[in-house]
Amino acid sequence: MTTLSSITVSVPATTANLGPGFDCLGAAISLYNRFKFSIADSAIEVKITVTGKEAPKVSTDRNNLAYQAFVKLYEYINQTPPCVLVEIDLGVPLARGLGSSATAIVGGLLGANQLAGSPLSQTEVMNLAIAIEGHPDNVVPALLGGCRLTASTSKGWVVCDIPWHPDIVPVVAIPDFELSTTEARRVIPTEYIRSDAIFNCAHLGILLRGLETGYGEWLQAGMQDKIHQPYRKSLIKGYEYVRSAALNAGAYEMVISGAGPTLLALTNSLTSSKVIAAMTGAWENQGVVTQVQALEINTRGAVFS
């Protein structure tokens, strides 16, 4: 077996929930963070360098999440982690609801697994990633690619690959302000009435068929939610204003991406440019600087180079 001394992992961003799929549904999209791990000869335990627009916000010591995941895998296989140089190139905005933490977890675990000689299977890496993150909706598509629905069973996690119709275009509006996942979770109730639970179950089923067929009426109906969005939207300035603009421009529906504050609209190639312009203008009218772009679904997941 050839022992690697360096490995680079490219991990896609993710948009989670898609409305009713709270903590269980997510899709990989075409924004990326890259993590390079190189075994070091020096006695320095870890040296981390970060590049990218938001690099100053990322920890460069042992508290770095990618490095913590790297160490966690070695602990899991009962080995001492090597001294390592970590180079991170950021392409996924931080604290925006695009799975930046999931990229770090997946990148760190995969980097460690490769340098350790691949002792863990992809499923074992996935299980460890879910355990670290606490929920599967971001880490699973970040690892595997595509749109994934994940559920826990008595035998472990079950992952379904959800077909995404090629005519459906995801448009993301990324604002210049952050929203912590902790704050976004704090406003969510701990208990729900039965009718709201039934509502989400029904609409998630409709959404999955809409994603598969590209049928606009199912997408519009399927993205409705009563579990998290009604409580989180108040944390996002101009949410209803931007949503109205997106729908008037032809989007099927607009939802919060992950914990927010990024907003996700699903549309098609005929209306995507109008939706982009409408969402940009609407948020700017609310005094929010935003980057709005049409992305693609990443079907490969995390890859090595």
Curated annotation (Swiss-Prot):
Catalysed conversion reaction: L-homoserine + ATP = O-phospho-L-homoserine + ADP + H(+)
Report if keyword Transferase is assigned. yes
The pathway noted for it is: Amino-acid biosynthesis; L-threonine biosynthesis; L-threonine from L-aspartate: step 4/5
Enumerate the InterPro entries for this protein: GHMP_kinase_C_dom, GHMP_kinase_C_sf, GHMP_kinase_N_dom, GHMP_knse_ATP-bd_CS, Homoserine_kinase, Ribosomal_Su5_D2-typ_SF, Ribsml_uS5_D2-typ_fold_subgr
SUPFAM superfamilies given for it? GHMP Kinase, C-terminal domain (SSF55060), Ribosomal protein S5 domain 2-like (SSF54211)
The free-text function statement in the UniProt record for this protein reads: Catalyzes the ATP-dependent phosphorylation of L-homoserine to L-homoserine phosphate.
Name listed for the protein in its UniProt record: Homoserine kinase
Species source reads Trichodesmium erythraeum (strain IMS101)
